[in-house]
């Protein structure tokens, strides 16, 4: 049974999310070093963090006619939305807020990132960031519907939008096993709303960094942190939605939640280094022709099962 946590969970949840994001960045750096033929070790793992002190003291870039307020609001929204999404993610038997509409809350925070990233592209009053922001909107329109149907599949199976109820409903069989399409689409959606790996089109090199192109200092650090915080949050949410939450033999519930989250996070980091960047127009075609019909059929499966009970 998942219970709403005490006040201290408000501190633990963001701290744990940050730790998972740091592990993901370190793991990605190690894979990058191996692919580049450099020495793999502690030095490779900490390399991305060496520039953090310099970024903290760097002067923000100022552009003519930029809307500094919208720019800063967009930059801050991305990591803040990622942290807020963790309020409904149970860790073991504890959750910060056991909302009856937890799935909706998580999805709403993810959609909030759309607005944040678009503002981060609009605010600088520069062509490349603006195009990057619009690229994310196009990408979002493609991945959001399949992602929503994947979330609906899990919620329909449990007949509840409460994340704890969805985890508890998998006591006999994980949803990842009998809803494999929903699970795979959800993982792709995590990479998409993190705009990492194959979905890094909004920050592509052909746009000189796109949304990230004009950011510097703390602003750039916040946007980059937001990407990895969302990856960690998405990996953690996969556990109660599709992998039975903290259920498992031998270990306490929190330990199983941690193990499963680390495995999903490791898989996502490995995938984002394996796949090339997908152009938004190609992903739109794939989503509307293939993914949306598949996820609709997948969502019908638990609905029919519940009707026949």
Descriptions of predicted regions:
Residues 1-309:
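Alpha-helical transmembrane segments of multi-pass membrane proteins predominantly involved
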């Amino acid at each position: 049974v998942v219970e709403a946590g005490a006040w201290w969970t408000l501190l633990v949840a963001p701290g744990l999310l940050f730790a998972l994001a740091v592990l993901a960045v370190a793991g990605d750096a190690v894979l990058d070093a191996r692919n580049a033929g450099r020495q793999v070790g502690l030095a490779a793992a900490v390399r991305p963090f060496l520039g953090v002190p310099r970024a903290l003291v760097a002067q923000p870039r100022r552009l003519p006619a930029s809307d500094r307020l919208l720019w800063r609001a967009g930059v801050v929204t991305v990591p803040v939305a990622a942290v807020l999404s963790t309020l409904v993610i149970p860790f073991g038997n504890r959750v910060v807020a056991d909302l009856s509409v937890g799935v909706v809350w998580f999805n709403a925070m993810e959609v909030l990132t759309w607005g944040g990233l678009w503002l981060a592209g609009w605010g600088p009053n520069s062509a490349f960031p603006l195009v990057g922001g619009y690229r994310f909107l196009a990408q979002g329109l493609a991945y959001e519907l399949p992602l929503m149907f994947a979330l609906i599949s899990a919620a329909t199976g449990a007949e509840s939008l409460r994340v704890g109820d969805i985890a508890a409903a998998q006591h006999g069989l994980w949803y990842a096993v009998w809803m494999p399409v929903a699970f795979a689409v959800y993982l792709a959606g995590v990479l998409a709303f993190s705009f990492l790996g194959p979905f890094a089109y909004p920050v592509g090199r052909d746009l000189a960094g796109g949304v990230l192109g004009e950011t510097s200092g703390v602003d750039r650090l916040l946007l980059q942190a937001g990407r990895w915080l969302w990856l960690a949050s998405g990996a953690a949410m996969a556990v109660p939605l599709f992998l039975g939450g903290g259920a498992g033999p031998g270990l306490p519930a929190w330990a199983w939640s941690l193990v499963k989250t680390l495995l999903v996070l490791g898989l996502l980091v490995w995938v984002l280094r394996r796949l090339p960047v997908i152009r938004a127009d190609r992903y739109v075609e794939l989503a509307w022709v293939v993914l949306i019909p598949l996820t609709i059929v997948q969502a019908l499966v638990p609905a029919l099962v519940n009707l026949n009970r």
